[in-house]
Amino acid sequence: MNTLLNRSVICAVFLVQLSPALSAEPAATWPAVTLAPAREVTLSGPLGESLQRGVARLAKPPYSEPWLRADVSFEINRIFTNYSGDASGRFIELATLTSPPGRLSPPALAPLLKTVASFQKPDGHFGVAVDLSKPLPKNAPPIPMLWGNARLLVGLVTAGQQLHDEKLLAAARRLGDFYVDSADQLCSPAREADYRSSGTYGDGYTCCYFPAIEGLAMLYQATKDDRYLKQAERMAEFFTKFDCLPVDHSHGNLCAWRGILDLYEITGKQEYLDRAKAKWDAAVKGGFVWPLGGVGEHWYVCFSGDEGCSESDWLRFSLDLWRFTGQTRYLDIAERLLQNQYATNQCPNGGYGMAHIDCEAAGPVAAIEKVDEWPFCCSFHGPLGLHFLKGYLATGSERGVIVNFAYDFKAPVKAAGQDWLVSVCNKSGFIDGRNSKMEIELAPRDKATARGTLLVRMPGWASGAKVIDGSGEAVTAPVAGGYLRIEREFKAGDKVIVEFQNGLALEGRRFQKMQVTAGQVSRVKDVAVLAGPELLFASPVKGGGRPVLLATLDAAGKLGFPTSGNNLVTVVLPGSDASDAQIAQAVQFGRPVFLRTWPGIVASRHGDPAFVSVLEMGDIGKSTGVKPRRLPFMFDLVVVPASSLAADIAKLAARAKEPQADQAAPIFGTDLEKRPENWAVSQGWKFMPQGLLVSGGDIGLIDGEGYGDYRFEFELTIPKEGQGIAGWVVRAKDEDNCLMFQLQTADSTFKAPEFKTRPNTLRPHRRRNGQWEIAEPVALPKEIHKGEPHQVAVECRQGTVEVFLDGQQIYRQSKVDLRGGSVGFRASGPTEQGLFRAVSLKKL
C-alpha cells in the first residue's frame, strides 16, 4: 500500500450541484404535449418483457370470473371482499386497456363486464348496505367499500369508453351519482374529527375516500356532466385538510394526487399544479423518496417494504408533472424508479407486490431479495403503470418530437402538424466501460422526407453527449431546457445516434451529488453508487447496516473500485477508519464483493427466488423457507488513490474469477480475531490489539460457506463492565438459524426468568427462523468470574455438538438438526460482553 493512505482526509466531500431530482429547468412557456396512444406503442427490451409478463399474469389463477367478481357479489370467500370493487375494478381497467384489437382478453374479462353492474345497489354504490350517518371508526364498513368503489369507478369508465359500452357508462354514472349524493355525509367539515379517528392507513377514511377524485374526473371527461367535476373539486379542496407526510398509505395518497392533476388538466387552474409540485418537492427533499427512486408502502422515510401500486402511482404522478411543466427532473426520477425499485418489485410469475427492504433510521440501506405477490392489487397496478408509460416514451408538441427515454420502442407521434413514427433502440452499458447509446429513427408517416425538430432528453446522470448520424458525421445538437435539439431532414432508415457520457457517481440519500478529491483518501458515509441511473447493489455481504467498502479514484478524478470493467469488485473493510495495513490485508485476503446493477443481480441468481402469493390473510408475512439475499445499496466508502493499490489488485482479481466466487470457501485458521476482513462486522464489535470485544449487534458470523465438521476454540474473558454474560454461535445456516451458547458468571447480576438466566451456568439456545428456543441451563463444574480468562472449545461432528470449558466437557447434544453452518459471536447489548482471543477454527 502507498503510504499516501496515511494522509487521509476524513469526509473529503462537498456538494457539487443539486441532483436532477432537485434541480429544475424553468418551463414557463412549456407547450401542450400530445402523448403517444399507448395502445399503438410497441415497447420491447426488458421493460417490454416486464409488461408482457404482467399482462400474462391476468390469465392465471386465481383470476377466475367468480374470484374477481366476489368483491361485489360475495359469491365466494376470498381475501378483501369488503373492499368492494377493488380487484374487479383494477382487473377491468388493465385488461380492457391491454386487450388485443377486436378481442377481450383474458377470458374472464367478457363475462365480468356483462355481470358486474347487476350487483350495483339502488343508491349506486357496490358492496354491503351501509349507513353513512353512523360514525366512521377504523375499518367501519363504508371505509373499505369506498376504496373499492373508487377503483371500480375508474374501471367502469375505462371499459365504457374503450369498448363504447353505454351500459357500463350508465353504471359508472350511477356510481358517480352516489358520490355526489353522499357528499354531505362523506365530505362534511362538521365531521372532520370523525373522519380523522380512523387514521390514514388502508382501513381509514383519508386513504379510502379521496382516490375517487380520479374516477370522478374521468367520468366528467366521458360525460361532460358538471356535477361530477364539482364533486371532484369539492373533494380535492377537502383533501387539503388531511394531506400530510409522513402518511400511512402512500398508494391511497398518490391516487388522490393523480386525480388532482387530472383536475388541472380539465380546468387549467394553476393551484392544482402548484399543489402537486409542492407535494412532489416535499417528498423528495424530505427523504420520503428513496435512492431506489420510489416510495414505501407506508409513506415514511424508513419502512420495511414498498408496494407495487405505490410505485405505479409515483411513476404516473412524476410523468404527468413533466407533461404539464416540461421539467426533466420528474423524468429523471421516473427513470431512476424504473431502473431500480420498479424492477425489484416484480415476482417471477409476472405479478407485483411488496418488495422487502432493510432500513435504518435515515432510510433504506439494502434490498431483500424477497417479494410477496399481492394479487388483489399490485399485480394489476404494476403493469398498469408500464402501460401508461408507453404514452410518454416519445411525445409531440408544437416544438417537435420529444424522446424522453432510452428504451426499446416504436411509437406514432404527432408533432407540429406532422405525423411521425419514432423508433428507438437502446444500446446502454452503464458499468462495462461503455457510454450509453440510443439509436433513433424518425420517419414521416405521409411523405418520403420531412424537416423536423427532434428533442432528446439529456439525463441528469449524463456528463455530456455526442450526436452523430448513421454515417458517423457529427450532428449539431445544442442543449436547452434539458433537451438536445436536433433540426434536420428526416426520412425512414436514417438514424441519429446519441451517446451519453457516464461514469460511476456518488450520491447522498437525498439525491445530492457528491465528489471526492483526487490524490488523497476520502472517507464518506451513507452514499449510493450509481452507474448512469442504476444503483449498484453489493453481494455477498453479511451482517446488517451499511457495509464499509473500498473504492478508488484515479488521477483524473474517475471513481472506480479495485477491480473495474465488466465486473466491479471490491472488499469489505473493518470500519471507516481502516488503517493502511487493514486495507492492504483486506485486498490481499478479503472475500471479493461484487457490485452489480439490478439486471446484474438478476443474472447472478441461481434460479428464481422463492416468493409467496398472498391469497389469504395467513399468507401475509409467511416465510418461503429460503433465506433471501440481502443486497446493500447504501454504503460507507473509503476512497483511496487507484495507484496505491496497484500491487495488490491482481490477487483480488484472481479470487474474483474463481469458481463460486459468490459463495466463498470456508475460512479455517488461527488468530481469526486479527482478521476483521473475514467477519460480517456488526455494531458493537471492536477489533483491538488485545482481542475482539463483542458488546452488541446481535449475531456476527465468520465469512465463508460449506462448513462441515469443525472445532471452534477461543480464550474468553467476560469483562467486568458488563453483567457477566457472553455468547458464541455454531452451526449457523444464517443469523436466524443457528445454535448459540451463553456463559453466565457466578458473579453475574443479570436476572431475566423469561430467558432462564442463572449464575454460573451454560445456557444452550436454538434459533429457528429468527425465534429463540432456550434449553434448561447447565451448571458449571467450577465457579467462573468476570475478568477471568477461560478456554472454550466446541466440537461439531455430524449431528453431535460438544462444549468444553478449560478442557473439561460441560455439555453434549446429539441429534442436532443443523449439520453445517459457520461460527460467530453474539451480544444483544452492553449487558452482554465478551473479549475473545486466540480464536481458531479447525476442520475435523
Feature annotation, model-predicted:
Residues F712-F714, E788-R797, V801-V803:
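Short tryptophan-centered beta-strand motifs in secreted/extracellular beta-sheet-rich domains
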Residues E25-P107, P135-L163, T206-R227, Q231, ...:
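Aromatic (Trp/Tyr) and acidic
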Residues A232, A276, L331-S436, V479, ...:
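C-terminal beta-rich recognition modules with glycine/proline-rich loops and embedded aromatic residues
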Residues G696-R766:
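Secretory/extracellular carbohydrate-interaction modules
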Residues N769-Q791:
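Short, aromatic/His-centered strand-loop micro-motif at the edge of beta-sheets
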Residues L805-S822:
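Short, solvent-exposed beta-strand-to-loop segments that form ligand-recognition rims
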Residues E673-I699:
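Extracellular glycan-recognition surfaces and repeat-rich motifs
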Residues L818-L844:
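Ligand-recognition surfaces built from glycine- and aromatic
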